[in-house]
Amino acid sequence: MPLPELLAPAGGFDAAVAAFQYGADAVYAGLDRFSARAEAQNLSPERLAVLLAHARSLTPPRKVYCTFNTLLLDAEIPAALETLDGLDDLGVDGVIIQDWGLFELARRHFPRLQLHASTQMAAHSREGVRALAARGFTRVVLARELTLDEIASTVRDRAAEIEIFIHGALCYSTSGICLFSSHAVGRSGNRGRCAYCCRDRLTEVGKPDAAAGHPYSMRDLAWLPHIPALVAAGVASLKIEGRMKSPLYVAAITDLYRRAIDGTLTPADEARKIADIQTIFSRPWTSFYAEGTGADPLAIIDPSAVGHRGTRIGTVQSVLRDGRGGRWLRFRTARALEKHDGLQVEPAAGGQPAGFAVNALRRCGATRDEISLPAGSDVEVELPPDLPASPASGAAIYCSASQAVRRSYPIETVRESSLAPLHACAVTVTLEAAGLVVTAEATDSCPDTATVRIPVELTPARNPGQTEAAVRKAFDRTRDAGWRVARLEVHDPDARYAPPSLLNDARRRVLEALTAARAAHRQAARNEALAHSTLSLDSPSAAVSERTHKEHTEPLFTAKVHVLQAPSEGLNDADELVVQIGLADDETVRRGLAAWLTVVPRDRIRLALPLLVRDSESAPLDTRLRALAADGWRHWECADIAGLDRLRRCVAQAEDITADWSLYALNRAASDFLCEQGITRRVTSPEDTEANLTLCADVGMIEALVFQLTPLFISQTPPCTGSGDPPSGSVAFADRRGQTLHTCSLDGRWITTGGRPFSCADAIPGLQRLGIRHFRCDWSWQPSDPTVLTAAWRAVRCGETPSGSHSANFRRGLL
């Protein structure tokens, strides 16, 4: 069985070099723009070209994938097209994508690019992978929440290559649908600007004696023990997270997993290398849901502290004072220590560790400083004078930086001058009596050619046997022109002589002409793509029901609720009621719908599918949909592309299908894609802005989200409360500013909403002037008091923002 690809992070050029040096088969790197790690070092197009050349110079050649996994605003489409064109020109081995608009542009205008579906697309099942593969993705990065059995089942399905994360940081929310950072501070995790709000320190509401903690702060994923199972399952690519990490970290973690995949990692080596890695960067590790979804939340979340901890090396015995008033930490070290290493001492009661450098080191009881001391030594380390409190006896001590580890992973320097250019061409040189004719043709998929004719009398050669060698020597010097000659043919039927100066001039001129031809060809392609992307979309399909698309001068208001929610008479004037059926059983769904039918008639009700569906939940949901279709339900809403395919399969009589906000369409290209898929109307994202909606409003299929109890987190994992036990059904937390978060269990997931709902209802008149007629209020993510719900509904219908709400990014903009 072939081994899987080991895919390492490359936050910068040096990290990529380190990854290749220590065994990565491929790296993934972001550019200066449009990367889900916008604050990583990232690469310029020029440095990406050098990295590609380096990767292809290695034996065997390695691969470079480019991350383009952010959501695009409409104004960014021209720059995105230029970036796609550059990636296509460089010939990257794959592009990792989240945005459906970007996918549409790449598929239509740059068909040579291999497209990989980012984990931000939240593929949770075989059907999710099938749906992505059916649209043209060749590889899918699965959601991290899957079990080993689910991964193996997805691989066996063979719909696309499967890539999974095996190590690194975890988001509390399912990747791609986290809105916390965006709503809290305008920094979208879907655009690479996450503010890591899930690491915040919070206090449980209603528990005055509970200590503050980090109830949503995840441990780091570490699937080292499961590598044999993943190899046996046939996973195509095993991916390490870490584009924000140092080259040293990348070297060490890549080396560890390379040895594990190859089967050369001994137990002793494993323990030593893990400890070394922990000195570079490490939170506590977790296997997450590898062995099933019933894992203990405390084995997944670390509520006591955040950030780098190190490797455990000892326990505080005491703190001594010297004659100068200095304080010395006494302990027995489990690993060798040397000056300038880093230590962290963890408070016995929890909380953030105290970190400091080893600036003075000595044996216990000695007065002479040492440069280093071996493992097993009883040592004393001087504490920094600015450390506010002395560590208590019994506190754990960690080594958080090691000079020895730094020396263990030297990173080579790439000799860039020795790298061959990326672009290859075939050259034909013809010597004639009347002059020299040189033709160069690009050998990649772009059919660019150039011919140069130099009229000059070529005399007979004195040594015709040396002519071809002279031509080859001249055309060997192409690096500065950005081309390498992959094939050279010399035609010299009359044995003519061409001086070296003429050959060099011909080389320069033909390669300049070929470069110009390539630039013109690519500019024309960009212009065509840009012209297409800026065309306004046609009106939605005429097949859409008359009730949805007849002309209205007044706004049409939609309310979305959950089938488990108690009906509210206040919604009886909704132009449309969307009922989320979730993953409730058949009888619960029937009872819930019957209750809502007492408020709104059937012809004004649309049924909505849940957002995340695992394989184990798929068959019961299909059965339920077929039963509902048989009952005559014709109007539906999907939340992802797999849901659209599910409806096509199970509800053939669907008269129209709309898309909820989670099928992101923040640009007209994405709306174009959804329209092409048969979507009749799409709900705007809770992240969207007024300026962006102004550009997108002409697509004619928009339903503006103007009120929502927004799901800031959607997670498989319950938060960890102060008691350490998962909440029984719901729990609330408050930050130091008094802002509250509410987390409840819904459909087997944990949904976190803020204390204040999102609303931009006061913008309805302006949005109407843009041509938008449909407006939505969404209560489907959290139970809502009927009185509060009715008051908010009435305010929104009057174009007023409900009391206590916030407008998120709508006016402040989105990073």
Language-model features: locations:
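Short, conserved phosphate-binding/catalytic loop or strand-edge motifs used
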Residues: E127
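Active-site pocket-lining/capping segments in soluble small-molecule metabolic enzymes
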Residues: M1-A123, V141-L146, E150-S237, M244-A396, ...
